[in-house]
């Protein structure tokens, strides 16, 4: 599947916000992205990146501002970019409600306009890997360009090693209002791609679409980062400790050479 086949607007839309942001979201999603988890994520990012007050941070694929607004509340100068107008509208509204400022811009991670501008780049909650391998590699090179020398990137994504051991072929989540969110998964071990068919049922109407995302084991992503111009690559679990094979999620930190 070529990179142009990825339809971000189909995946990241108002339906996604309904099930991942706001009241009544499924319990599984609350554990993943709810307020308590989001505050812990922001603290972990600050700690692993060793961010100083006023650090210039780019939240790449910032979504509805879950991380960007919390980093701004911690005293950092944050820019958030995302391809979804709906997500950016929600992000700006949340920033206003929190009394923080984030420079939100609509954009494409394949065409980043910055050169040496940021102290850190954040890419959180499986927001990387939706294109073909050449394009995914090019995204990392663009991230390196956006960072000042010595700046750091942090990525949080699925851990392929764990996924291969405990693959879930299907999952269903139910909103408090009865709306349904269901995924059928196929993990291809030859390409390290997770192919998903998602069905969303809201107000009695069903919509089904497909997408895929590239998964990584740490050594492969480390090598990709080295090739893109990074060094000092480290792998962590969700708690910031050393990465283990049984961690479902993987946090990777690297420094621009």
Residue spans for each PLM region:
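SAM-dependent methyltransferase
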Residues: 134, 154-224
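Conserved class I S-adenosyl-L-methionine
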Residues: 1-61
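A short acidic, Gly/Pro-enriched loop at the edge of an enzyme's catalytic core
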Residues: 113-120
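C-terminal lobe and adjacent flexible extensions of AdoMet/dcAdoMet transferase-like proteins
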Residues: 218-257
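Short glycine-centered segments of the SAM/dcSAM-binding site in methyltransferase folds
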Residues: 56, 150-152
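A short glycine-rich, Lys/Arg-flanked "PGG" loop and its adjoining helix->strand segment in the class I
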Residues: 137-149
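Class I SAM-dependent methyltransferase SAM/SAH-binding core
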Residues: 66-111
């Amino acid at each position: 599947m070529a990179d142009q086949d990825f339809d971000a607007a189909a995946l990241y839309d108002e339906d996604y916000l309904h099930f991942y942001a706001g009241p009544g979201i499924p319990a599984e999603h609350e554990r993943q992205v709810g307020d308590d988890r989001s505050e812990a994520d922001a603290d972990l990012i600050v700690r692993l990146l060793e961010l100083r007050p006023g650090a210039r941070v780019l939240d790449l694929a910032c979504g509805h501002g879950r991380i960007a607004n919390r980093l701004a509340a911690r005293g950092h100068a944050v820019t958030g970019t995302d391809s979804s107008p709906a997500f950016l509208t929600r992000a700006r509204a949340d920033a206003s409600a929190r009394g923080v400022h984030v420079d939100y811009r609509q954009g494409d991670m394949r065409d980043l306009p910055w050169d040496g501008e940021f102290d850190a780049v954040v890419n959180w909650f499986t927001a990387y890997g939706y294109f073909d391998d050449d394009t995914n590699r090019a995204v990392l090179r663009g991230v390196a360009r956006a960072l000042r020398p010595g700046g750091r990137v942090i990525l949080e994504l699925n851990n392929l090693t764990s996924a291969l051991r405990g693959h879930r072929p299907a999952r269903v989540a139910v909103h408090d209002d009865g709306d349904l969110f269901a995924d059928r998964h196929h993990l291809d071990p030859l390409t390290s791609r997770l192919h998903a068919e998602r069905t969303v049922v809201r107000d009695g109407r069903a919509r089904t679409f497909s997408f895929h995302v590239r998964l990584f084991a740490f050594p492969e992503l480390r090598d990709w980062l080295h090739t893109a111009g990074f060094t000092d690559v480290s792998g962590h679990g969700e708690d910031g400790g050393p990465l283990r094979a049984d961690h479902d999620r993987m946090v990777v930190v690297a420094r621009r050479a």
